[in-house]
Amino acid sequence: MGKSAQPATMKSSRRLPRRWWEIGVILLVVVIIAGSVHVARNTAGISVGELDPIDRRALEEYSEYAAAVEDAPDSAAWLNAAATEHPTLLISRKTHFSYLINPSQEVSSPFAAPVDMGDNPAGLEVYRLDRIYPRLLPIKVAGGSFNTVGETTTVQGSDVYYLKFGEDNFDKQFSSEHFITFFAHESFHFYGQARWALDSRVFGELSPHGVELLDERMRLLDAVRDAGADQARLRELATELLALEKERLAADPDYVSQERWMETVEGTATYLGIMASRAVGYDFGPMYFDNTKEARFTDVVPFLESGQIDNDFLRNRLPYEAGAQLCLLLAALAPSGEWQAFLNEQSLDSHRTLVDALGHVFGQEK
């Protein structure tokens, strides 16, 4: 039995490599066929109507905003800093597909499928990139939600601004994280503020007199909002604001200086989010919160004194809202965009704030 078993074992071992070779050939054929089908499908392209509803909505909203920028750049975008004039990459957290919009270089890749956008107001050129596109795997796994200032991301030869999005960017009302609102805000930091100093935090607290002056400022900002398009009233209120700002700076110089800079950096970005929202019909503006819209600025100090909000709100949220309202005031008083040109001329070493821009519009240089 021992001798007869050996030849059988040797015979079996000689057949094993051949079996694995046959399995390997079959797998290779399957991979080649699947790859060929995939490449053929990508070459043929895909209709926007075939996309996941969230992905489709993001592309359609982007196209609507881009068309508004083309039609009315003075109101929908910032002077010389329109994000939609650059290649963009949208990364879907839901489907894990990515969408390359208006590439600067010709796209030729088995991982890229042209998307037929159909009724596309901005005439976008769009490619869907596969979930497993190797270049994007590090960004999907370890990258942030969007490009930060100074960060370069190149996809298919195009330097892009990327943004990740998901269902939560479409299912909330009055939200600064609504898709196009969020895109316009964050992309403005990238394209519009690359030469601005971005150390925009507020530390410390206002003095008791400073809180009183803040209350007066809140009253004026509500009055600005209530004035609508009344130019005479807006100019009157702007003059009062400039006078008040001198008092505030004298009372709390360090705090007010930090506040002015933060409301310039974040207020301008919030303003861009507001204009983008208006372009696509999404309801968003200054003092919008998850549970309410158009809250009154004049509620801030009473809420502070009653403990309903604390100084963190004054330091970390109010500059976004007050800055956006100042931008809307400047846009109403100087629709030609001279205030934006004024802010664009600043550098990393020389700050120009929204209060400075208001003084510039009124010929009151600092």
Across the structure, where does each feature detected by a protein language model lie?
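Post-HExxH zinc-binding segment in Zn-dependent metallohydrolases
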Residues: 194-251, 255, 259-285, 289-301
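N-terminal Sec-pathway targeting helices
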Residues: 11-30
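Short pre-active-site segment immediately N-terminal to the catalytic Zn-binding motif
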Residues: 166-183
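Short, intrinsically disordered terminal tails adjacent to the first/last structured region
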Residues: 1-11
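Auxiliary, metal-adjacent structural segments of Zn-dependent hydrolase domains
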Residues: 61-166, 197, 201-203
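Active-site recognition of the HExxH zinc-binding catalytic motif
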Residues: 181-193, 270
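Active-site-proximal alpha-helical
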Residues: 254-283, 292-362
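Non-catalytic terminal regions of proteins
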Residues: 24, 37-83, 88-96, 123-127, ...
